[in-house]
């Protein structure tokens, strides 16, 4: 058992939290799963749990991207666009990670926040990537969010800016997470279920490949923001073409334009 680190995981029952637990178990790293819900009313209980466990590191996978309304399940961030969901969005996507920061900021405990890269939108003045497709542009760690097309992205953008330059925090941006399994949260699985696809070059995060890097940065107590994505870009159509070739030769899909997508979302 590696006793040089003791990691307390918030959001351990979520998709990425479970992936991280499995990864740590294989490394024989000591970790604990937080039992207290991150809520301002639970602040004293959170502090008590942290003191009892006495971790060297805290990592948060807390976030809200889906949920139920009545008997209907919303599996995407469309859930947060429904009436009455702003409070839930603010609670889980802004207040929870900020509350953890406020609790930990005067301690020696390193804090890793798993955030998102879904806070950026292509603009003509964004820096071009060398040797990449003509319509591909690069966002850097110091760039500020510029996408306000969803309630989720707006709230996450403010969280990102609040935490990005704070001491003793690793702010990790992931984008379109992919794994090797057919599971609902896998980006590949998601887009195979869509009726139409708006295909644009984008960054992706292949989770099994990137978890070791997150862990190494945690171990070194790295502070700052990192765009935790794989090199280069790939379009939705390229992903689906590989899915068709490797998984299901009978699979087909339809495209629509950004303008048509905007009409649907408006």
Task: Kindly give the residue locations of the regions a language model identified.
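Mid/C-terminal beta-alpha module of Rossmann-like enzyme folds, strongest
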Residues: 213-265
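SDR active-site strand-loop-helix element
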Residues: 10, 61-62, 111-117, 123, ...
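Catalytic helix-loop patch of NAD(P)-dependent Rossmann-fold dehydrogenases
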Residues: 82-96, 118-172, 179
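A short beta-strand-loop structural module common to alpha/beta enzyme folds
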Residues: 29-41, 253-258
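Conserved cofactor-binding/catalytic machinery of classical short-chain dehydrogenase/reductase
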Residues: 42, 92-99, 110, 158-159, ...
């Amino acid at each position: 058992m590696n006793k040089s680190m003791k990691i307390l995981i918030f959001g351990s029952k979520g998709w990425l939290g479970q992936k991280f637990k499995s990864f740590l178990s294989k490394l024989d790293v000591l970790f604990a799963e937080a039992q207290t819900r991150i809520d301002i009313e639970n602040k004293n209980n959170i502090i008590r749990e942290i003191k009892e466990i006495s971790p060297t590191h805290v990592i948060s996978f807390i976030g809200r991207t889906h949920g139920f309304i009545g008997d209907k399940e919303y599996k995407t961030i469309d859930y947060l666009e429904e009436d009455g969901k702003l409070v839930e969005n603010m609670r889980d996507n802004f207040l929870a990670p900020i509350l953890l920061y406020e609790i930990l900021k005067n301690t020696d405990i390193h804090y890793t926040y798993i955030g998102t890269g879904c806070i950026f939108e292509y603009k003509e003045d964004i820096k071009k990537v060398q040797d990449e497709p003509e319509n591909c542009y690069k966002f850097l760690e110091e760039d500020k969010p510029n996408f306000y097309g969803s309630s989720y992205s707006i709230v996450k953008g403010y969280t990102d800016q609040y935490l990005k330059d704070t001491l003793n925090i690793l702010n990790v941006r992931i984008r379109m997470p992919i794994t090797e399994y057919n599971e609902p949260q896998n980006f590949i699985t998601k887009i195979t279920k869509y009726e139409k696809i708006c295909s644009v070059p984008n960054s992706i995060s292949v989770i099994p490949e990137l978890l070791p890097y997150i862990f190494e940065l945690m171990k070194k107590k790295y502070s700052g923001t990192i765009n935790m994505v794989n090199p280069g870009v790939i379009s939705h159509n390229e992903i689906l073409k590989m899915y068709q070739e490797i998984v299901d030769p009978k699979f087909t899909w339809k495209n629509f334009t950004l303008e048509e997508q905007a009409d649907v979302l408006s």
